[in-house]
Curated annotation (Swiss-Prot):
Disruption phenotype: No visible phenotype. The keyword Membrane applies. The gene is KCR2. Pfam families: adh_short. Probable reductase, but unlike KCR1, has no beta-ketoacyl-coenzyme A reductase activity. It comes from Arabidopsis thaliana. It is a single-pass membrane protein. The chain crosses the membrane at residues 14-34. Its main location: endoplasmic reticulum. It is found in: Endoplasmic reticulum membrane. This is Very-long-chain 3-oxoacyl-CoA reductase-like protein At1g24470. PANTHER family: ENOYL-(ACYL CARRIER) REDUCTASE, RH59310P. It comes from the Eukaryota. Substrate binds at S190.
Amino acid sequence: MQGACISESQPWYLHFVCFIGFLFLLRVLFIPLLKWFTTRFLLTPKRLKRYGSWAMVTGATEGIGRAFAHELAKHGLNLILVSRNLSKLESVSDDFQQEFPHIKIKIIPFDFSSEGGYGAIEEGIKGLEVGILINNVGITYPRAMFFHEVDQLTWTKILRVNLEATTWVTRSLIGPMLHRRRGAIVNISSGAAVVVPSHPLYAIYAATKAYVDALSRSLHVEYKQFGIDVQCQVPLYVSTRMVSEVAAIDKPSLFVPSPEVYAKAAVAQIGIGSRCSPFWAHSLQWFLVGLVPDNLVDTWRLSIGLRRRSLS
């Protein structure tokens, strides 16, 4: 008994429509699921120390950055911690040194939102074999705002921290990595720029994170041949102070991991592909959002932004 789509009595254009439908399902369902299964269960996490003995983490005193640094220390990597608050840096360094007495830790106090140059970072990493860079530092709006409501100081700081800092730090470390022909660079983007088609009332933030995504994916293609793995990681909500302030999410849940849970998944994905959403529930959300028409997602995101604006 023949199915409707392959019956010889059916007009040719029905066969064509069935074929197009098959290609659509292949593209939308099968290939993403196969890629997800392969990266989660078949590919072995890379041995991180092969990239080099030091790892540098920006925005390292709290949230995802601190958790990243802690996870890298578990792998025996020496740490360069960069953040603007010296006292917090010293506190984190002391905590890590007690827990991991066998590693070396260097702290660099630096405010990425300032107008000054990056000489302090250049001096701080001089002579060190930095094999892994985690470009984690990032800021967003203090509250949901229309584009015309964002003051110049706010959007200037967002551009400096999210865009300029990522570019500069990547540029400063990729040269030595190229000389050694090994290294890993992880740039943290956001679901606001990659997973959803728009992020109303946070437009500048989303635009900077879209830049991070495009930069990372292009650099992945450029430098893979030289042994440098450049990767864009795309988190959705993680239970951090910034997310608490923006989205009023103050504790972990099934779809909102703690920084520690997220970082464990994120470190395991270093060097595997040009772009990923490391936490399993985030990647599931990404897949499901991709099945919804963009205009519906846009309407949903706008309603969320307007509600947050009314409450601020």
